[in-house]
Amino acid sequence: MVMTDPIADMLTRIRNANMVRHEKLEIPASKLKREIAEILKREGFIRDVEFVEDSKQGIIRVFLKYGQNNERVITGLKRISKPGLRVYAKSNEVPRVLNGLGIAIISTSQGVLTDKEARAKQAGGEVLAYVW
């Protein structure tokens, strides 16, 4: 079966594993998913990420992060630009998520960036997801 939206699948897998407090999860790899996982790690939403090469496309292993008393670090993930309705933002219209408490993941001509990085580089692009 062909997957129509692999980014939504990745976010759903992370959301579901986070809800049941799994320590790690595995996601089929792609270049875009790797970049999104690296952003989540860099911004402190996940503990670690590793890339496992296999005979097919590879696997991204995501290690989820929890706070004291096993509370979730990721409270929400939302796919914004979908295959049926793409959402773009100009460089001066890059969205803020919860007044800066969350991040927007944006695919720009300069690579996949957070909303803060896109504002600093004055780059617009496709708004992939919100994470808070």
From Swiss-Prot:
Organism: Bacillus subtilis (strain 168)
InterPro entries: Ribosomal_uS8 (IPR000630), Ribosomal_uS8_CS (IPR047863), Ribosomal_uS8_sf (IPR035987)
Quaternary structure annotation from Swiss-Prot or TrEMBL: Part of the 30S ribosomal subunit. Contacts proteins S5 and S12.
Assigned GO CC terms: cytosolic small ribosomal subunit
Function: One of the primary rRNA binding proteins, it binds directly to 16S rRNA central domain where it helps coordinate assembly of the platform of the 30S subunit.
Pfam families attached to this UniProt entry: Ribosomal_S8 (PF00410)
Keywords, alphabetical: Ribonucleoprotein, Ribosomal protein, RNA-binding, rRNA-binding
One GO molecular-function entry: structural constituent of ribosome
Protein name (record): Small ribosomal subunit protein uS8
SUPFAM superfamilies: Ribosomal protein S8
UniProt family annotation: Belongs to the universal ribosomal protein uS8 family.
GO biological process: translation
